[in-house]
Design a protein with these regions (language model features):
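Proline-glycine-enriched beta-turn/loop adjacent to the NAD(P) cofactor-binding site
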Residues: 12, 37, 55
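Gly/Ala-rich phosphate-binding loop of Rossmann-like dinucleotide-binding domains
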Residues: 19, 23, 160
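Dinucleotide-binding Rossmann-like beta1-alpha1 core, especially the glycine-rich loop
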Residues: 50-125, 129, 136
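Glycine-rich FAD pyrophosphate-binding loop
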Residues: 23-47
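Short, hydrophobic alpha-helix immediately C-terminal to the catalytic nucleophile
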Residues: 16-20, 155
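Short amphipathic alpha-helical/adjacent loop interface patches that line ligand
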Residues: 37, 72-75, 161
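Beta1/beta-strand and adjacent pyrophosphate-binding region of the FAD-binding site
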Residues: 2-14, 32
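Helical element adjacent to the flavin cofactor pocket in flavoenzyme catalytic cores
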Residues: 140-167
Length: 167
């Protein structure tokens, strides 16, 4: 039987990163990831849309808002270091009717309170950013929302784990 100091259940992006942080903090420890799929990251992490969220959907001062904003920065830095392409596509949030304008206002306020760069745009500006999108009167543009290939990201993070001796 094999013995490990730490065993992580689940080899998705979170599990791999938890294993890496444990190994970095306890360098002499043995760390193992147990994954039900044949390879790490083959379940949800490898099949998601790869969105790097900006952090304006969450309430001010919430842990989710902090992690989202900090994670956006950290993931961008990691991708830059590893030469992983980031698709700087931005994101638009539109309103279908007058009632949904109130929801846009809530998101704008959350973004402001969370120190997230959001731009209120009109219908003409929206058509310049995304010609196929339609909105009622105005919309929100989030320039710091982006996407990254989940498979390339997982592959790179797995390589980091391998280099640290994680099993």
């Amino acid at each position: 039987s094999r013995k490990f100091d730490f065993v992580i259940i689940g080899g998705g992006i979170i599990g791999i990163n938890v294993a890496i942080e444990l190994k970095r903090n306890y360098f002499d420890a043995t760390v193992c990831i147990i994954e039900k799929e044949c390879h790490l990251g083959e379940h949800a992490s490898g099949r998601n849309s790869g969105v790097i969220h900006a952090g304006f959907y969450y309430d001010e001062d919430s842990i989710k808002a902090k992690f989202c904003k900090d994670g956006n920065f950290a993931l961008r830095e990691y991708c830059k270091q590893k030469n992983i392409t980031i698709n700087e596509c931005g994101k638009v949030v539109v309103a279908k009717n007058h009632e949904e304008l109130e929801s846009l206002d809530v998101l704008l306020q959350r973004g402001k309170k969370n120190n997230v760069d959001l731009i209120e745009i009109d219908e003409h500006q929206l058509s310049e950013i995304e010609p196929s999108a339609k909105t009622f009167q105005r919309a929100i543009y989030s320039p710091n929302t982006a996407t990254v290939s989940p498979t390339k990201l997982i592959s790179s993070i797995k390589e980091d784990a391998d280099n640290l001796g994680i099993k």
